[in-house]
């Protein structure tokens, strides 16, 4: 299918990774981020590396393949583990009064879109939602991931690796969950949930918050910078809280000029709907951050 600017092609008739792929990964498969292994990576497991998580898991999973279509093999030990992430490693306790107070605040903000797993979100120690990039200058793989920093406070950290398997977490936290990062005009930028933008000079320290676009129901996203008719644009593929079946939307953001003036271009367009068989889709080839892997977790 197309939306006038992007052609979407389904590849295969099943997800590339499922709970049947290996018992170590569990049944909740969340947040895949795929890179092409750079030439300088020593003894890569495969040409492509896929980092993903259980949304309340204790380590970042890792799969590898020599073709984007697969077959994909699970690297059973995974990559970064909770104990080495810098985040809380034990679940927190919460009393009924505090839970009700927090639930009321969420209900006032989100209405009937209140998360089903709100209690787990508030107290469960975990790491999830990796966003992985190749830093050729430093010859490092850079991972943005989130975890539980305090009661109800999920934050993003950076972890780095020289072999694509073993990661070292850095101490600083940078913002809320679901950082999706991109480079533009001498800065590293991050789009976090829901539609909040951050920036840093080096992409590893000192992220500052700027504008917010989209709406409060924006959830997961993937981003890339493209050249539009009037200058640089950010192409955003994203999902929306409450959509059933889940669908992937595409939005365009003008990022020409100061970020205070960034703005959405037109209305979001649906490019994929979960009503069809769930599988991998190829949108386009991006250097290192390759074809977007889209699968709907049950």
Segments predicted by a language model, with ranges:
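Carbohydrate-active catalytic/glycan-binding domains of CAZyme proteins
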Residues: 1-298
């Amino acid at each position: 299918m197309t939306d006038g600017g992007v052609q979407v092609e389904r590849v295969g008739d099943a997800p590339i990774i499922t709970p049947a792929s290996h018992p170590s990964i569990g049944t909740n498969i969340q947040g895949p981020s795929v890179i092409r292994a750079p030439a300088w990576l020593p003894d890569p497991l495969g040409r492509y590396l896929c980092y993903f998580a259980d949304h309340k898991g204790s380590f970042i999973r890792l799969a590898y393949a020599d073709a984007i279509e697969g077959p994909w093999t699970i690297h059973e030990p995974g990559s970064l583990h909770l104990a080495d992430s810098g985040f809380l490693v034990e679940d927190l306790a919460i009393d009924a009064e505090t839970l009700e107070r927090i639930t009321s605040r969420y209900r006032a903000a989100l209405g009937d879109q209140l998360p089903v797993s709100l209690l787990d979100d508030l107290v469960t120690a975990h790491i999830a939602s990796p966003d992985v990039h190749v830093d050729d200058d430093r010859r490092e793989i850079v991972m943005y991931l989130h975890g539980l920093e305090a009661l109800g406070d999920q934050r993003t950290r950076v972890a780095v690796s020289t072999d694509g398997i073993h990661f070292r977490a850095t101490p600083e936290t940078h913002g809320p969950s679901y950082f999706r990062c991109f480079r533009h005009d001498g800065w590293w930028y991050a789009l976090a949930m829901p539609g909040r933008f951050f920036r840093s000079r080096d992409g590893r320290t000192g992220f500052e918050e700027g504008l917010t676009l989209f709406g409060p129901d924006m959830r997961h996203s993937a981003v890339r910078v493209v050249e539009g008719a009037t200058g640089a644009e950010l192409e955003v593929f994203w999902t929306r809280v409450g959509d059933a079946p889940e669908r992937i939307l595409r939005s365009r953001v003008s990022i020409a000029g100061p970020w205070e003036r960034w703005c959405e271009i037109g209305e979001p367009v649906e490019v994929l709907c979960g009503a069809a068989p769930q599988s991998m889709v190829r949108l386009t080839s991006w250097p290192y951050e390759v074809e977007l892997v889209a699968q709907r977790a049950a």
